[in-house]
């Protein structure tokens, strides 16, 4: 069941899934991309916008050690007929 526009939902994104598949020095950039893909799939959104705080949390311990999971709040809005998911820290 997709998220209704304007509804707030809290997700826990399992970043650990990609940590062993990516070289150590690429982990934080790949984690940011994974968060976008995961939210797009689960929120049924065509576009995903991450707040700067989410990116800072991913990079907090450097490129090699992103967190294993990330708790985020997602709000879906319809802009010009496209579903846009806005992601912030929960």
UniProtKB/Swiss-Prot annotation:
Assigned keywords, A-Z: Ribonucleoprotein, Ribosomal protein
GO molecular function, one term: structural constituent of ribosome
GO BP: translation
Family assignment from sequence similarity: Belongs to the eukaryotic ribosomal protein eL31 family.
Signal peptide: none
Organism: Thermococcus gammatolerans (strain DSM 15229 / JCM 11827 / EJ3)
Domain of life: Archaea
Pfam families to which the protein is assigned, alphabetical: Ribosomal_L31e
UniProt protein name: Large ribosomal subunit protein eL31
InterPro entries hit by this protein: Ribosomal_eL31 (IPR000054), Ribosomal_eL31_dom_sf (IPR023621)
Name of the gene this protein is made from: rpl31e
Assigned GO CC terms: ribonucleoprotein complex; ribosome
Phylogenetic placement of the source organism: Archaea, Methanobacteriati, Methanobacteriota, Thermococci, Thermococcales
This protein's record includes keyword Ribosomal protein: yes
Keyword check for Glycosyltransferase: no
């Amino acid at each position: 069941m997709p998220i209704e526009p304007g509804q707030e939902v809290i997700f826990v994104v399992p970043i650990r899934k990609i940590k062993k598949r990516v070289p150590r020095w690429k982990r934080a950039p790949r984690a940011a991309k994974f968060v976008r893909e995961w939210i797009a799939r689960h929120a049924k959104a065509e576009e995903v916008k991450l707040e700067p705080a989410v990116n800072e949390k991913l990079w907090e311990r450097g490129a090699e050690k992103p967190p294993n999971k990330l708790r985020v709040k997602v709000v879906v809005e319809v802009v010009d007929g496209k579903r846009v998911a806005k992601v912030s820290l929960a």
